[in-house]
């Protein structure tokens, strides 16, 4: 198949999943064309059967806001025609599914067709899509898709609740990991020594937005460090970074907290982690949690959104109510102070991630969906 993929290319779960899916499809013999405004951050410079088509958003004084959705539709139309695409796979509904529908209408005028598959990732439904400014166009765009997926049962239910979507079927296809990449044994432990070879390593990876509650990450760490000598590694960047740095200074742990900024390849870092901390208000899936589990790092998180579908509470991690810093810290301390328990949870985490979320199995589900949409 010739597949077009549109996603947000910047740091974040939806773009990472879309890119990894495209690479995996190309490895299985498909031709993949990424159509977006910038090369996706996880896409290498060159791979066989993988192509990148940049969207040029013209800037004119008349437009206060450049019309990316229209420019994207034009570029999609060009790529479909030039490369004879079989389908467009849109990751994140707004504006990608809308642009794909416009493309579909343009092709219809030429007596041609393109199938549109839309994957819902989270905030496109739970936040952006429910904004009154976008609600009706979000509902329209996803209902006009030829196939529709959500990354978790939680998000499937949220979509049905918020939009009805009686005219469409939503299949759940979860995010995935490449077991070979997230293999703790692949990495030599040098990164761990750089942090502090004698301390436990707690880690957090996100876009540092309010929903991630990264000040809670620092608070949990401060409590853990009082009982178990530890360091905290913070990977990512975003609007709440300054508040987290301030929190670390006020709690007197700033010398033991490492802010590394955005890093594309997180597997070597996760191989050095003893625990992964994710105290979010909500997670539609929790890709970073899955990557941590696959690396053998138990997750301390919240009973929020789709996270309980990823983390088996009490087996591969511990989930607490949102905002329960004391509970999360207590759980982390209990695990870190019991070497046998940590080993058991670490093994279970890695095994469960591979059993339920292995790349080959999930990519095959997408291939089956493509075939069904094209039938």
Identify what each model region corresponds to:
Residues 7-11, 23-68:
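N-terminal strand-loop element at the rim of the active site
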Residues 149, 195-221:
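Conserved donor-binding/catalytic core segment of Leloir-type glycosyltransferases
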Residues 154, 176:
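Carbohydrate-associated surface elements
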Residues 262, 281:
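Aromatic "clamp/platform" in nucleotide-sugar-dependent glycosyltransferases that forms part
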């Amino acid at each position: 198949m010739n597949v077009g993929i549109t996603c947000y290319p910047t740091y974040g779960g939806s773009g990472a999943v879309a890119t990894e899916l495209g690479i995996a499809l190309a490895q299985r013999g498909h031709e993949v064309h990424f159509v977006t405004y910038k090369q996706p951050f996880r896409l290498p410079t060159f791979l066989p059967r993988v192509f990148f088509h940049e969207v040029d958003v013209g800037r004119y004084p008349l437009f206060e806001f450049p019309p990316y959705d229209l420019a994207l539709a034009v570029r999609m139309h060009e790529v479909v025609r030039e490369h004879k695409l079989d389908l467009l796979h849109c990751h994140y509904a707004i504006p990608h599914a809308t642009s794909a529908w416009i493309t579909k209408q343009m092709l219809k005028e030429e007596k041609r067709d393109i199938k549109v598959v839309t994957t819902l990732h989270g905030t496109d439904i739970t936040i952006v899509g429910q904004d009154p400014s976008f609600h009706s166009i979000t509902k329209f765009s996803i209902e006009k898709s030829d196939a529709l997926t959500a990354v978790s049962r939680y998000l499937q239910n949220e979509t049905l609740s918020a939009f009805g979507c009686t005219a469409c079927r939503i299949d759940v296809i979860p995010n995935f990991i490449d077991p070979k990449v997230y293999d703790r044994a692949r990495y030599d432990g040098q990164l761990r020594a750089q942090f502090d070879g004698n301390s436990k390593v707690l880690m957090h990876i996100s876009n540092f937005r309010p929903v991630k509650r990264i000040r809670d990450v620092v608070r949990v760490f401060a409590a853990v460090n009082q009982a178990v000598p530890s360091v905290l590694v913070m990977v990512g960047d975003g609007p709440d970074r300054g508040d987290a740095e301030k929190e670390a200074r006020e709690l007197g742990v700033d010398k033991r907290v490492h802010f590394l900024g955005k890093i594309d390849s997180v597997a070597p870092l996760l191989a050095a982690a003893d625990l992964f901390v994710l105290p979010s208000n909500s997670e539609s899936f929790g890709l970073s949690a899955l990557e941590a589990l696959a690396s053998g790092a138990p997750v301390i998180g919240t009973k929020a959104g789709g996270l309980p579908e990823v983390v088996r509470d009490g087996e591969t991690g511990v989930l607490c109510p949102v905002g329960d810093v004391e509970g999360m810290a207590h759980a982390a301390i209990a695990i870190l102070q019991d070497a046998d328990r940590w080993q058991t949870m670490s093994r279970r985490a890695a095994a469960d991630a591979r059993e339920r979320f292995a790349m080959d199995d999930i990519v095959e589900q997408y291939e089956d969906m493509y075939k069904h949409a094209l039938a």
